[in-house]
């Protein structure tokens, strides 16, 4: 019986990630056949440049796939099985401000952690809800596979504001780290590992890693990580310097709890000062990306569109993103794949807020994710996670209630922010910088000396 | 690489189930190779009659397996990978009293439900702990696969009194009912179904059943069960009348909650009067088994031992018990099989006592079971389960504290017992009947008029 | 400074309790000055006969109090500080059916316990919500002091359907039993006792009783109750036979848990058979009341109205109801009185459903009740209470969702109902009997053989 | 009937607080009669200088009180009704190091908050347990009234390591702040206020303050505090500059949550930088106290002992400490006084760790404290409190398990410590400084770059 083929819309078509993901989808048509692929964005000019290249890729590799790029929600979201969402409200320009404003006050300036993540979240909530509503309006049976950042705040927002929506929140960081673990262990693929992991998004720990036979791989990994972090002795693939620092820093982050292996983003919470020291407040990661990947991708796309051929294209298949296909297939074919998803806790972590959105192993089938219980977590992780989940929940409360006070409280609570005064100064700058993107907040009744 | 082969001891070697299970093990040597098989029992005379036949089976079908039957704990439990426990403290004679005493007062008289289950539990706790202690003394790395009844009370006792023991509590009733569901659905095996189920042992509900592609099979099953119970239109295999009544009664039990499919044992709690009406206080199920299966198995074993051949044997392979092999393989080879096990709740059912032993789907690997979260259960099931788990916990508290009062409270709480007076009368009879098996209870300070 | 005086409306003016309560209010004007007293009922003819007498009482004892009896909600609920609610939807006639229908099937027939309480609850919810809405419409700052039965179901309904309403649910049974305890102990008033108590309404236990100096009075009380129940050696006041049986039966109920002293209503759950045995299905307590108190009160009221004098009145001050004044004063004057109220659990009982309405000691002030924590309750009480609270919650869910199925589940769960079939038969009779009072339930999809 | 009089031992007799407290006790003999007063300390030389003066006070004011100062536990703790504990293990010298070491790294250096509190806690646990064990050995019916700091860590330690001990943990900070609130409101005493408050010790918030009639005093207080902090317009009593800064800083701390009024210690967590800025790493509060109060008290005591008269004594009655008498009287006479105590949460705060030691209003009687439920707390306070309670619990776990790793985790988690590296550096210095007082910790397996 010929496998059913699917209709996909990529929300955030103008993203620099779109070409690599389209190539990845075209590379997995065997397992995941596609009949229709659409790009949707609210920035027509930007999306058309990306779409030009994707059109060439598809005509060359799978001409029978119906392809369209549109800014019309009805066209984009009608007759769709899956929405693959990687939107970035405010694009890199706003990300630069997210990073630079905190650094002005000596505070971590990062895309999803600390004040930057809060600012980015306050922009993203409206965007993700909008797309979710389009999906439910035009394709009520569709699923949204959301890997838009900051996933933690977006996931809490969809839990609170769209509790019954068919949205799966997933993050690629654990995938990337597990790829490195596999290299460190000499395995051919991370899929040879069975892992137990828990935390919030960008804020978690591996507690058990076995091979297929059930042998415990943690001792070997811990031994390696305690010396080299997540840098394999022989790098399969060269990475940018800043990523290399991150994987090396895992060494110190792991020292804080030798019983586990940490998600690398914890560096921003446990060693914020080190992060600030190596940041340039006037030229942050966002600037690197704009000058690096964004420039590269758009120049390549223009060239492919111009030459109506991908022959000279240097754009690589983003196979690292194949977890999106795994997730889509799990829903489509009830595969029961074991994947880390961001889901409502509801008892999975026994001694943690049942309404928190936690990142835990799930068995994914056509009915969605079945979280696997974690049990009780140690006090160190509970203390860190309760603090951080309160930041995320207060941010969503602030967005929903247009509350300056609650957003200030979110910043005060963040482990990356040293005190309430700096929190207030950063917030006032962020309000100003985001006035075109955030809901208008009520005026805080309180001043501090 | 030649698969590792295992050493097994069957605790309760003298059980009538042993021959069928040994035949089943011999039928599954391909997937689960065995190097040594021992029977252990504290009733030498009874075990030797069973062992005689098993010896013949093994010599005929797998002569290289080292076989022994012993009443010496050290011999039995040394160099063992798995203990397969199906003990019955007090044998069928006491089960007959468990059933007859309550019936004397018009109350359900059943092996594991109501006062009978409480009495049986009070006998079994000591027996299971004893075996567990032998295992940990002589083979500290071994696992106990316990399907001794009453599994709910035994599981609560091991949780409370041996919290760190490597014991897996499992029950074959859901396996049996799922076999029938598969027949009703026209599937070749229950393993083609992916199920979601929750409850206490002998006290649970299926909430979702899909085929491999994720299609919802519940509507079809509910339609069938609401008319015929768990009786397929064409019975694959004739069953005893009393089992047939049970599978038919599922029809009425299911009516109490049309959203789910019930475990058949719920009939004793929702329709106790019907159960009592069709029981004969002087000739209960235990008597049927003694006159039926027990007599049959022992005569067959004597014959096989006499003829030193299984040629004329009518003892069938108990393939229904192959779930035991599935469980052993999951531990041995880290298969990650999805099975219903009785595990500590600890958040799996979000709105239920975290310390309750609940029967839920688990992913089973070499580290043991990983329960899959159930989420929040409806008020009807919560009310029934909280009442019943209190019966089970009070029984274990009564055993541990030798408390007549707590055992009376357990009986008062049972849905099968109409009032505190009858609970008291039954308890006093059971105390008398079990004085050789139960711990000696303190004298209750209270009388009732 | 002259104490503020209050405006009261008694909802359920036509109740036989109204005259005694009015006399009690007039007897407590010193502590609780009243400027305006209104009676409200939806049965004008019945209320006018009661109002006639009350008019005489007020003119004789406190002529400056403005008095009115009305069936007009706006008039009744405008300019009101307190609504004192003792409504009985369906009056005694329906209560008779509540009691007789279950008895037909050998099941407890009682006003607030078992099927009778469920039926009464299904009538009362709408009535209490209606009054609450009138109060909030016409006197938004007022408080409703609700002692309408069945208080447990009414309290759960107001929690779920009017979560922010200023309603205090209180019951007089503990007050009555504590009065008797005081007599047993030789104290002049129950107010010399400091008690710790927990449970659901009509379903609780005293765990600690001290005198003012902190001496433990439990041993002496337990000693007495274990022999005589709640019957003091010398009765201060003769009670009706049925009440006497109830207070005597406490002896057996207490035996089920010698560590506590029980609420007498537990007799219907622990000794339902004894209750049924002494009931006459054709002449229940409701009939006794109609023939007894109801006839007496209305004849007395007619006489007082006729004679325009209370001189020959035999209607007594209902000082037992002075707890209503205590509660009103606590709100009015922020007295911080310690009283048993029915409040949302929310942690008061640590190991019990946080959304359950539980009866626990509270400190009552102008902001309402502050529940005192109970801590963790034993397994016996938890099992009983979880079962019973599920009955109450399912009844309110059934009312809100018009669900025949959920009401059947409520009856199945009740400890007083022996099995699902009898539950179904009783339900079908009750549906028929209450078609003028209950919401119209959907048709249950299920039949049982 | 002549009131019973009591035997008291003050543990930490050599404390500078002892004279003021003894004078306070002598000033309250009417409400709390004392027959025997003993001082106990393990520093004889220091205690004798204090005892000399106390001996004079007692002979002058209540000669019939039996007085003794001893370093012998049996003598001190025999025939005792109450142990009043204000011990300081390591005295002010170690407190100076607690404050100076963190300041070396730009981190808050304070007696009970941040690294200083953790270091002080690691010294105090052993000391308080020792005294508790003496009390239970020699006067098993006695109660310990503990106001030794750091009360939060000491309370968690006694909860975990002595769960059944009769110890009441109380703190005087809320008392001091409520005194100031009363002045701000123009009330004669804080006892005219009924408060609702929750938090951890030195980490809480007032949520409701009423006068006796139930009028809401919060608006007026919030208005004042948002401008002047806790500084009344006319100071009843001049305070030291550092205390004045603290009460003024409440203004900024309150801005973080305008719905509540904060405990002043929150300044160290919300404005750590401001605290560090005004600290002199070489001359901290401990030095001020040694040079100030300690020198003053010991010189005064020497003079009183020399002159065998208190005539020229400038030592004031520490009436601020009369809360200790209130607490003792509540136990002794079952007064049911409403006081803030540090008790096991166990549901009092519904959405917070049930095993946390929380500071909440309690009704105190002869059976000990009955916590009043708080209900659910907002996300901001929950985030802050979960982080801080994890610091406290990890400190006690580190003490009990002699774990360097867990103590490092406690420091990492503290909101006052900027990152894991500084946490590590501070810890290594504190280990060195406290080697005579802390248990010897295992060596951490981990290093950081």
From Swiss-Prot, chains A, B, C, D:
| EC numbers, comma separated | 3.2.1.122
For this protein, the activity regulation entry reads: Cellobiose-6'-phosphate and 6-phospho-beta-D-glucopyranoside are not substrates but competitive inhibitors of GlvA.
Q: What induces it?
A: By maltose; repressed by glucose.
What does the record give as cofactor? Answer: Mn(2+); Fe(2+); Co(2+); Ni(2+)
Q: What is this protein called?
A: Maltose-6'-phosphate glucosidase
Site note Increases basicity of active site Tyr, residues: 111
Q: What else is known?
A: Reaction proceeds via a redox-elimination-addition mechanism consistent with an E1cb-type mechanism. This includes redox steps involving NAD(+) and stabilization of intermediates by Mn(2+). Because it hydrolyzes 6-phospho-alpha-glucopyranosides without activated leaving groups (such as maltose-6'-phosphate) but not glycosidic linkage of naturally occurring phospho-beta-glucosides such as cellobiose-6'-phosphate nor methyl 6-phospho-beta-D-glucopyranoside, GlvA is certainly more appropriately classified as a 6-phospho-alpha-glucosidase than as a 6-phospho-beta-glucosidase. The ability to hydrolyze beta-glycosidic linkages is exceptional and applies only to activated 6-phospho-beta-D-glucopyranosides.
Q: Which residues bind NAD(+)?
A: 6-72
> How does it associate, per the subunit comment?
Homotetramer.
Report which reactions are catalysed by this protein: alpha-maltose 6'-phosphate + H2O = D-glucose 6-phosphate + D-glucose
Signal sequence region: none
Q: Which free-text remark accompanies the cofactor?
A: Binds 1 divalent metal cation per subunit. Manganese, iron, cobalt or nickel enhance activity. Binds 1 NAD(+) per subunit. Is only active with NAD(+), not NADH.
Please list the residues that bind Mn(2+). 171, 202
Describe the pH profile of activity: Optimum pH is about 7.6-8.4. Stable from pH 4.0 to 10.0.
Question: Is Membrane found in the keyword set?
Answer: no
Q: Per the similarity annotation, which family is this?
A: Belongs to the glycosyl hydrolase 4 family.
**Gene Ontology cellular component list:** cytosol
Role according to the record? Hydrolyzes maltose-6'-phosphate and trehalose-6'-phosphate. Is involved in the catabolism of alpha-glycosides accumulated via a phosphoenolpyruvate-dependent maltose phosphotransferase system (PEP-PTS). Is also able to significantly catalyze the hydrolysis of both 6-phospho-alpha- and 6-phospho-beta-glucosides containing activated leaving groups such as p-nitrophenol and does so with retention and inversion, respectively, of the substrate anomeric configuration.
- Molecular function as annotated in GO: hydrolase activity, hydrolyzing O-glycosyl compounds; maltose-6'-phosphate glucosidase activity; metal ion binding; oxidoreductase activity, acting on the CH-OH group of donors, NAD or NADP as acceptor
Q: Which residues form the active site?
A: 172 (proton donor), 265 (proton acceptor)
Q: What is the effect of changing residue 359 to D/G?
A: Loss of activity
Q: What InterPro entries does the entry give?
A: GlycHydrolase_4_CS, Glyco_hydro_4, Glyco_hydro_4_C, Lactate_DH/Glyco_Ohase_4_C, NAD(P)-bd_dom_sf
Residues reported to bind substrate:
95, 149, 285
Q: Name the UniProt key words of this record, in alphabetical order.
A: Carbohydrate metabolism, Cobalt, Glycosidase, Hydrolase, Iron, Manganese, Metal-binding, NAD, Nickel
An example of a Gene Ontology BP annotation on this entry?
A: carbohydrate metabolic process
């Amino acid at each position: 019986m010929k496998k059913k083929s699917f209709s996909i819309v990529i929300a955030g078509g103008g993203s620099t990630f779109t070409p690599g993901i389209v190539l990845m989808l075209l590379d997995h048509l065997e397992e995941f056949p596609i009949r229709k692929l659409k790009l949707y964005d609210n920035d027509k000019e930007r999306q058309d440049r990306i779409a030009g290249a994707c059109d060439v890729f598809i005509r060359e590799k799978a001409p029978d796939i119906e392809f369209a790029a549109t800014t019309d929600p009805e066209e984009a979201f009608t007759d769709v099985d899956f929405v693959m969402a990687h939107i970035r409200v405010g694009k890199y320009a706003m990300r630069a401000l997210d990073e630079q404003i905190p650094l002005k006050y000596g505070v971590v300036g990062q895309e999803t952690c600390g004040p930057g993540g809060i600012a980015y979240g306050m922009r993203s909530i409206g965007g993700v809800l909008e797309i979710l509503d389009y999906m439910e309006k035009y394709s009520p049976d569709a699923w949204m596979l959301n890997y838009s950042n900051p996933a933690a705040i977006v996931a809490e927002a969809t839990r609170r504001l769209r509790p019954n929506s068919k949205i799966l929140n997933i993050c690629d960081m654990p995938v990337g780290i597990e790829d490195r673990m596999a290299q460190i262990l000499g395995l051919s693929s991370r899929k040879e590992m069975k892992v137990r992991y828990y935390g919030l998004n960008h804020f978690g720990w591996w507690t058990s890693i076995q091979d297929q036979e059930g042998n415990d791989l943690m001792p070997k990994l811990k031994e390696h990580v305690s010396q080299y972090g997540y840098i394999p002795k022989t790098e399969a693939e060269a990475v940018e310097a800043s990523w290399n620092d991150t994987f090396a820093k895992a060494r110190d982050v792991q020292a804080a709890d030798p019983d586990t292996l940490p998600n690398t983003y914890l560096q921003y919470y446990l060693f914020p000062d080190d992060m600030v020291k190596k940041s340039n407040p006037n030229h942050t990661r966002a600037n690197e990306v704009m000058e690096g990947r964004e420039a590269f991708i758009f120049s390549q796309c223009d060239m492919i569109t111009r030459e109506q051929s991908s022959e000279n294209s240097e754009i690589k298949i983003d196979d690292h993103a194949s977890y999106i296909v795994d997730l889509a297939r799990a829903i489509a074919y009830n595969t029961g794949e074991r994947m880390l998803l961001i889901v409502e806790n509801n008892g999975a972590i026994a001694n943690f807020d049942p309404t928190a959105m936690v990142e835990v192993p799930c068995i994914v089938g056509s009915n969605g994710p079945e979280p696997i219980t974690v049990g009780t977590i140690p006090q160190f992780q509970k203390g860190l996670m309760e603090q951080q989940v309160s930041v995320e929940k207060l941010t969503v409360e602030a967005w929903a209630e247009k509350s300056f006070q609650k957003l200030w409280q979110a910043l005060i609570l963040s482990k990356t922010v040293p005190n309430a005064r700096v929190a207030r100064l950063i917030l006032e700058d962020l309000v100003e910088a985001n006035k075109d993107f955030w809901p208008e907040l009520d005026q805080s009744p309180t001043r501090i000396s």
